[in-house]
């Protein structure tokens, strides 16, 4: 994934420029969080590498005991299955959240702020490319391009 982010760096920045051009607010802090320049893409690459270097979180024993009746109880870490994250317009979260979810064996449903739609879709495209190149299905990482009402409907009935 880090290699793909590097290869697609200019396309990521170009997609982000579309988001920045369409940004209609005067909230400087939000604009700064939305911005994905060369430095921010470098940070995304570094975050992928940092997660890669972490120990595998799956199957670690948390505790283990034998009950007096002989039953053995072992508590091990395991994936949740599928998680969803709803976040503001910060394209780097698309990379960081998906990295952590994938590393921990979870599928992830991403819903970023509407202001970062072009950036997020490009970053999810990068994820799908990385998954495909490694013989995995793209359903590990999915992006919901939903408005507020459709998001709330999904949360009421997540099918």
Feature names for model-found ranges:
Residues 1-73:
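N-terminal Rossmann-like NAD(P)+-binding subdomain of aldehyde/semialdehyde dehydrogenases
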Residues 53, 61-159:
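Rossmann-like NAD(P) dinucleotide-binding subdomain of oxidoreductase/dehydrogenase enzymes
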């Amino acid at each position: 994934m880090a290699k793909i982010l590097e290869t697609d760096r200019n396309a990521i920045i170009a997609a982000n420029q579309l988001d920045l051009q369409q940004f209609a607010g005067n909230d400087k802090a939000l604009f700064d969080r939305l911005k994905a320049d060369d430095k921010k893409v470098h940070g995304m690459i570094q975050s992928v590498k940092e997660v890669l270097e972490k120990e595998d979180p799956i199957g670690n024993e948390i505790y283990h005991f034998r009950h007096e009746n002989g039953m053995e109880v072992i508590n091990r870490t395991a994936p949740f299955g599928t998680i969803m994250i709803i976040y503001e317009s910060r394209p780097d979260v698309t990379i960081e959240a998906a990295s952590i979810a994938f590393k921990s064996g979870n599928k992830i449903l991403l819903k970023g702020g509407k202001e970062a739609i072009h950036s997020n879709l490009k970053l999810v495209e990068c994820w799908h490319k990385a998954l495909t190149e490694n013989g995995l299905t793209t359903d590990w990482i999915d992006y919901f391009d939903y408005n507020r009402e459709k998001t709330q409907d999904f949360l009421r009935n997540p099918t």
